[in-house]
Amino acid sequence: IAVFGCGGDRDPMKRPIMGEIGVKCADIAIITSDNPRTEDPDAIIEDILKGVKPEYGYYKVVCDRRAAIRYAMDIAEKDDIIVLAGKGHETYQEINGVKYHLDEREEVAAHLEELRN
């Protein structure tokens, strides 16, 4: 299961390519927001989807990155691997010049705790 998006204010020509590769290479692709910066997150996702065809595989759009991570964890089955791509060490989501706290490690740990209870 791959969770990925494309950053805003970066080369928009790469977005369809990333969509194609992301959906082709994952059993399940979850397309989400990744530092939209000054761009509209929905417009970035629309650019990503220009490279995606239904025959490439299953994908779902979940614009909110926290919700996308939780969705991936909710649908994962035994022996599935979830790849959270793009953020790496970053602990924020940059939206319109503001860096909002978003640490994917914290999100995963919190949702794992919820799933256990």
Which residues are covered by each model-predicted region?
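ATP-dependent carboxylate-amine ligase
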Residues: 1-117
